Amino acid sequence: MHDAVTRPTPPADATAWPRRITQAVKIGGVTVGGGHPVVVQSMTNTDTADIAGSVKQVADLWRAGSEMVRLTVNNAESAAAIPRIVDKLRMMGIDVPLIGDFHYNGHQLLAAEPACAEALAKYRINPGNVGFGKKKDLQFGQLIECAIKYDKPVRIGANWGSLDQSLAAQLMDENAQRETPWDAGRVLREALIRSALDSAERAVELGLPRERIILSAKVSGVQELIAVYRDMASRCDFALHLGLTEAGIGSKGIVASAAALSVLLQQGIGDTIRISLTPEPGQSRTHEVIVAQELLQTTGQRAFTPMVTACPGCGRTTSEFFQELAGVVQNHVRAKMPEWKITNPGAENMTLAVMGCVVNGPGESRHANIGISLPGTGEAPSAPVFIDGEKSVILRGENIAQEFIGLIDQYVERTYARRAG
């Protein structure tokens, strides 16, 4: 039996619901849950045994802003590689927590490679394939005992595609006895939730503290994910990892992830997220990190980099210059953020506007910390710049982009300079 958790009362103003109160889970130098900011994580797609390739991708993901990185640990070679990957990253000054993703044979790999068990910051366990039949409880117990021995947290991650079939069959049989049976989808959602919750309670019985457990119950459908997490959040106080199990490729994957996760986050549900995008050909793996950050920032959860507002363009904006400038500005502030984070803390909260005509340009620019209203079709060839709501200067000529970038840099230095002491 799982304790019910009272759902927060929704706010009357334009803010998100209060965050759900959960256990706080320490993962390396990162804390998940317990009211801490929602954590961005990602996963490599390299062969973990390829140490050089894995180190490079983890470093790339970390530089992009991933606060934890998960790697596949599926054989002896990948398990043996983990300590060496950690060592090489630390030599580069990168101390990002690494999560081992285990399926089927994790109990064997951790027992055979104690250095791997020690080097990882967290273990991911799938209750649907940790063992089958009589071996399930034994092998799950071995993984939990390893987590206890090395003082490591775990994520117990149930998955729609690898659901515990014995539990699903049991719940289907129980459902058939109901006076009013549930539909099959509801039974399977319940099986997914029960798989995660029952496994978590079993881990606690074995001696793993509740503050060492994170749960997830992933599906690929937006409405199903929302329903699963709302239900699971009401039945426990474990920290929750959000994400579609396979979001998809391109805009579909981004939209599906945003549609599902933003609803849950606005209701105070979720302590760490991963956007499981299928990379497009030639696209960097870091794209999923950027999308995760932008989702958290646009929903008001966290700030990572100055946000640029830009109009979509219409018949009044036949020039493409405002589009080009918006891209230049976004790339500039993203490139500067690693430096600003140290020298100008708070710059990530800055808002910028790059507008293309007089209709909304001045108004949007006044709402931003710094905004520029470029001339539309038939308008005078001048671009007023607004700083903190006041018209500051009018830019003209061939160097508008460089001058506007300079004004942004000056504003950051003036407004967010780190104070001595």
UniProtKB/Swiss-Prot annotation:
Signal sequence extent: none
Cofactor-binding details, from the entry: Binds 1 [4Fe-4S] cluster.
Residues the record lists as binding [4Fe-4S] cluster: C311, C314, C357, E364
Pathway: Isoprenoid biosynthesis; isopentenyl diphosphate biosynthesis via DXP pathway; isopentenyl diphosphate from 1-deoxy-D-xylulose 5-phosphate: step 5/6
Main EC class the enzyme belongs to: oxidoreductase
Molecular function per GO: 4 iron, 4 sulfur cluster binding; 4-hydroxy-3-methylbut-2-en-1-yl diphosphate synthase activity (ferredoxin); 4-hydroxy-3-methylbut-2-enyl-diphosphate synthase activity (flavodoxin); iron ion binding
Role according to the record: Converts 2C-methyl-D-erythritol 2,4-cyclodiphosphate (ME-2,4cPP) into 1-hydroxy-2-methyl-2-(E)-butenyl 4-diphosphate.
Family: Belongs to the IspG family.
Protein name, entry field: 4-hydroxy-3-methylbut-2-en-1-yl diphosphate synthase (flavodoxin)
Organism: Xanthomonas oryzae pv. oryzae (strain KACC10331 / KXO85)
